[in-house]
Amino acid sequence: MVSAVLDSRFNVALWIFQRHPKYDVVDALRRCQHRCWEFVDPHPPRMQRQLSSTNLSFHITDGCHPYPAVQADGSVSGGLEWSGADDGDCKGSAWGSQVYARSAWYNNKYAIMYAWYFPKGKGRQHVHKLHSGHRHEWEFAVVWVDQPSADHSNLLGVSMSFGPSFHKEAPVQPEHVVGSSIKLDSYSTFWGAKQGLRVTTDIGTTQDLIQWEQLTDAARASLTETNFDIDEAVVPVEMPLKDDVFQLKLNSTYPF
């Protein structure tokens, strides 16, 4: 049974860019990995309770911590050039963190996709073949439940992105759940060719949640139109919640 009470960690607020005039748009685009402010709303809609009740415990074995990808005015993170340590300059943002969510019915099951943005990620490039990483990374997980209810839905399974493929667990094993949250781990393969998610017994942290529909029009447009695959990674980097990708991901990661 999936059941939880919404707490302040999952409050979602729209940050108004004009409240911080010293950060102009150019600066935000250039150094947003250290300047992007998360979305937080003190009055989340009813659906927020369902998304929060299945929000995921996020542990990091390897690589960057998740960051906000976009601000309310549409300014997008410029990411980090791949260099140095896997988590170099990306161990967490003082301006908050973020997990993005979008949900839909699929094959008579209710799918909730959660997506995390990272300023850089592991994985080969087509052009610089000796590089073991690239600018920008998106990882996602799909939680499958029987109905969109915070108090009366049953957890059926989880799918997790992993390079060009995915991991799955259906049903989810008890050791991979804490409270009503599935425990996930962000990691990469030994040679760094793939980065993705897996279930774990380790407890991680949670990020402030924002629904795709709650983003400003400018933020949604920027996430849709921005080319996050500027380094031409062998596994293309794309925002999984946007319209032309979301349904394809549900289809390709269906675990039943």
Swiss-Prot record:
A motif (Conserved undecapeptide motif) lies at residues 111-121. One of its GO terms (cellular component) is extracellular region. A motif (Conserved heptapeptide motif) lies at residues 133-139. Induction: Addition of glucose or sawdust induces a small and progressive increase at 2, 4 and 6 days, and a significant increase of the expression level at 8 days. Expression decreases 12 to 24 hours after infection of Castanea sativa roots and increases again at 36 h, suggesting the existence of a complex mechanism of defense/attack interaction between the pathogen and the host. Keywords: Secreted, Virulence. Pfam families: NPP1 (PF05630). Transmembrane segments: none annotated. The structure of NLP effectors is remarkably conserved with a high level of conservation of a central region containing the conserved undecapeptide motif AIMYAWYFPKD and heptapeptide motif GHRHDWE. PANTHER family: DOMAIN PROTEIN, PUTATIVE (AFU_ORTHOLOGUE AFUA_5G00600)-RELATED. Belongs to the Necrosis inducing protein (NPP1) family. Secreted effector that acts as a pathogen-associated molecular pattern (PAMP) recognized by the plant immune system. This is Necrosis-inducing protein NPP1.
